[in-house]
């Protein structure tokens, strides 16, 4: 309430009152009141987008770092190399780009859209000769077995990514093994070249444990007609390990596992397939902390 003979004045553009002294009043009381200021800021922050490498061999993985942006909206990444999703890592965002064994050699563009602004980065894929391997004819699979595999495994390729769960090198699931068919090799049967292998088949010692390659969450554990006893572990950031032809299973869907933990028992053979989304990548660099999965690992 104002003293008698005082006026309330509102200045143009303001939302609060101010006291104006009436000079006709002698010995006015000391004015008291409060002040309120409001400001509106527009902050324009430009993101920084960096690749772990500009040249990548077939079978490899490149990391994409996105920093210097505000807000919680995830950046969007588009590339013909595969489906790529971003996750929070440290103070920024991280995505991983696969170069499948059959990715076309040459330049590939990754378009990163952040807050309506698009950044283009070029990744050059280098060809790699994975060699050939003699194999026995594989028995034809039934349509029912193929459909069962598609219904249970293919949906995992496009699941939303979870936070990064691995730390350091991955572990080969079999401690003792001999490689029968390696990643990327052309399979030769009776002198005729066939398809390339997108997985690695190992000769293993029956009864030994099958180990989790890294920390993660089991997203599938069960028996399939096409691949036998199967375990799929989600390691975060779209990286998943697919372990086929186990003798026994010792984990269930939804279970959290640690690196080296037994997820089952090995039979005579183990097929392992490491994927980023739906694209298989070379497993051996993962066991040696080599490649984009280990670039600036803490963000």
Task: Describe the residue ranges of each PLM region.
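Zn2+-dependent peptidoglycan hydrolase active-site motif and core
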Residues: 198, 212-247, 269-272
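Short, well-structured beta-strand-loop connectors
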Residues: 209-219, 251-266
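Conserved, short, structured surface segments that act as functional micro-motifs
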Residues: 231-234, 255-299
């Amino acid at each position: 309430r104002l003293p008698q003979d005082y006026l309330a004045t509102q200045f143009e553009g303001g939302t609060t009152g101010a006291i104006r002294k009436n000079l006709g009043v002698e010995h006015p009381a000391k004015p008291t009141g409060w002040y309120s200021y409001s400001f509106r800021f527009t902050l324009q922050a430009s993101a920084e987008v960096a690749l772990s490498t500009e040249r990548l061999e077939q079978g490899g993985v490149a990391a994409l770092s996105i920093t210097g942006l505000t807000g919680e909206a995830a950046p969007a990444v588009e590339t013909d190399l595969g489906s790529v999703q971003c996750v929070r890592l440290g103070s920024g965002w991280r995505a991983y780009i696969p170069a499948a064994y059959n990715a076309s050699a040459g330049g590939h563009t990754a378009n990163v859209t952040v807050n309506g602004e698009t950044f283009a980065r070029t990744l050059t894929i280098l060809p790699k000769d994975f060699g050939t391997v003699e194999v026995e004819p594989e028995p034809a699979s039934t349509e029912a077995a193929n459909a069962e595999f598609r219904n249970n495994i293919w949906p995992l390729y496009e699941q939303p990514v979870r936070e990064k769960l691995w730390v350091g090198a991955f572990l080969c699931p079999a401690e003792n093994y001999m490689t029968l068919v390696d990643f990327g090799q052309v399979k030769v049967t009776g002198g005729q070249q066939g398809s390339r292998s997108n997985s690695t088949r190992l000769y293993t010692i029956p009864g030994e444990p099958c180990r989790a390659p890294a920390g993660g969450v089991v997203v599938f554990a069960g028996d399939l007609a096409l691949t036998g006893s199967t375990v799929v572990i989600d390691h975060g950031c779209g990286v998943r390990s697919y372990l086929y032809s186990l003798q026994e299973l010792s984990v269930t869907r939804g279970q959290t596992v640690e690196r080296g933990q037994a997820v089952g028992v090995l039979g005579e053979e183990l097929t392992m397939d490491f994927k980023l989304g739906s694209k298989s990548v070379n497993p051996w660099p993962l066991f040696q902390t080599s490649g984009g999965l280990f670039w600036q690992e803490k963000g």
